[in-house]
Amino acid sequence: MSSIRFIACLYLISIFGNCHEDPYYQPFNKLNITLDIYTYEDLVPYTVDNDTTSFVKIYFKKFWITVMTKWCAPFIDTVSVYTSHDNLNIEFYTRDEYDTQSEDKICTIDVKARCNHLTKPEVTVQKEAYRYSLSSDLSCFDSIDLDIDLIETNSTDTTVLKSYELMLPKRAKSIHN
């Protein structure tokens, strides 16, 4: 365990200059990840493979989605899939109570959407010093929107501490919303 902390400290030193203060640290104990995909491919049937510790994979007829978490105290223990014509909405979230994220472990979330037949190069967008990433080749998708919420919950309150939005293709938000 001490070797992992040493490596994490070296990583923090290389990025932030020291291993004691992480400017992106949030003391969250729940995750909420929402993925909106617009595609012309069939959205049913699908199968879900969830190990409830570090990954969730969802397989569709012509594409698949993988959500990988690394060194996160809260786990994705619930997956909800909603389909409507060309819109796919998937929620990955923490329903149960977990420990608060430790400052000495950097939680990373990596979401990949892959088409069975690649016709375009892979594109990746990232936030917060590469902690959160979304990648896809966009061969069978019109667009992908990913929202990540870091949540703190206790016996009396639930608070969203930080939210991140990643989009493919990368585009500017409309100021007229």
Swiss-Prot record:
It comes from the Viruses. Residues 1-21 form the signal peptide. Keywords: Early protein, Signal. It holds the Pfam family CrmD_SECRET. The keyword ATP-binding does not apply. Belongs to the poxviridae C8 protein family. This is Protein C8. It comes from Vaccinia virus (strain Western Reserve).
